[in-house]
Amino acid sequence: MATTLFRLAGRNAKRHCMRQSTTIAHNLNSTRAFSASALRRYAEPSYEGQGTRLVPTGDDFAPNNDLYGLEALKADGAPRVPPQDHILARKVRHYTVNFGPQHPAAHGVLRLILELKGEEIVRADPHVGLLHRGTEKLCEYRTYLQALPYFDRLDYVSMMTNEQCFALAVEKLLNVEIPERAKWIRTMFAEITRILNHLMSVLSHAMDVGALTPFLWGFEEREKLMEFYERVSGARLHAAYVRPGGVHQDIPLGLLDDIYMWATQFGDRIDETEEMLTDNRIWIDRLRGIGVVSAADALNLSFTGVMLRGSGVPWDIRKSQPYDAYDQVEFDVPVGINGDCYDRYLCRMEEFRQSLRIIHQCLNKMPAGPVRVEDYKISPPPRSAMKENMEALIHHFLLYTKGYAVPPGDTYSAIEAPKGEMGVYVVSDGSERPYRVHIRAPGFAHLGGFDHLSRGHMLADAVAVIGTMDLVFGEVDR
């Protein structure tokens, strides 16, 4: 049985092998020589029997069937006018990137939406408000004295100048004149605060660009100034020292001598920083010609402070509208020429020296006398009087529980803060609490001009532009 099946299988195999093979009829029209150009029917496959068909969505997606450009010629050899190139006519979409809010060079919670063309900044859209705390509204629910510490939290790098601005506004509404010693103390600590701010500004700017050493050197000097803050007010950061009616307390013994000793050696620290940066080739290349703003544009963008003076406008509120003891000191206002980041850096370096000059004059001209107005309805009586006089104790109790009533009216007070013009608009309805407080922060206006300063620069230059603005988002977002 097995043998019979084997024979049948062999015969069937022989029969299949001897069968005539089927030949495929070739179409002579489809036969062509080898060429680089493919036939159009191969480029447009159609599988209608299977329910699928590839349909081109536009002329731009059609295959290039004329590799040698023969179709672009007329019969006489003259070139034809090519149709509109849809790819070139189509708008090119720029790349959008988020800068921050967690970027180390953003100096806080800055969020920038940058529209880039390659690495070139086409448009910059700053988004603010991530540090908004409602400071202006909170002040409406506090007495004038209780509202003062909120100003320390605005620009938390230059604290006492914020307090000074609010105190001047309240004193203008109260129509009081503070003692001379209080004026000189305020002026001296305003310049110490200016040095504190510029140290942070210039040296963190240098660190953002890539120079680490000046940052470490400068913070050693900032530590000494923080000690002066602590000795005069008890707090290193949020001092609440400058108050309506004067200052909180007199300068402790020995502090003026220590400030003098510090001021005599700080000039050498400025020179060391300038040796590291001013003639540094990398520093110059990163700053010169970057963030240029003309004097007219700076005025139109509401720039103040160094951002305005760097463009050649000699505007300083300490000179034009002097307050406290600034009308009794001599100093110069440094002004830039080109309006770029490098000129603004040079202005800040010169302001170090001018602030030292003012501090020396304050130390030499500091008069003796009280540091607060002797009106116990505005400033508290001394501790010794409280322990002996019942009326002084009542004044102290009412001052810190109820506060003092400010006559109805409104006023705007502006000072030359380290970052620019810091202004406070206060409206009083005659009660112990302000009806409205509006804060004019210089950094808010400067950040509004970021698009103007950065447009056309590289992405890496955005860090240099942010650094030269000296932004602190406590005051920008308020």
UniProtKB/Swiss-Prot annotation:
Subunit structure: Complex I is composed of about 40 different subunits.
EC number, as in UniProt: 7.1.1.2
Coiled-coil regions listed in the entry: none
GO molecular function: 4 iron, 4 sulfur cluster binding; metal ion binding; NAD binding; NADH dehydrogenase (ubiquinone) activity; quinone binding
Keyword Electron transport attached: yes
Keywords recorded for this protein, A-Z: 4Fe-4S, Electron transport, Iron, Iron-sulfur, Membrane, Metal-binding, Mitochondrion, Mitochondrion inner membrane, NAD, Oxidoreductase, Respiratory chain, Transit peptide, Translocase, Transport, Ubiquinone
Gene that specifies this protein: nuo-49
Cofactor note: Binds 1 [4Fe-4S] cluster.
Pfam families: Complex1_49kDa
Protein name (Swiss-Prot/TrEMBL): NADH-ubiquinone oxidoreductase 49 kDa subunit, mitochondrial
Mode of membrane association: Peripheral membrane protein
Names of required cofactors: [4Fe-4S] cluster
GO biological process, one term: mitochondrial electron transport, NADH to ubiquinone
Functional description taken from the UniProt entry: Core subunit of the mitochondrial membrane respiratory chain NADH dehydrogenase (Complex I) that is believed to belong to the minimal assembly required for catalysis. Complex I functions in the transfer of electrons from NADH to the respiratory chain. The immediate electron acceptor for the enzyme is believed to be ubiquinone.
Main location group: mitochondrion
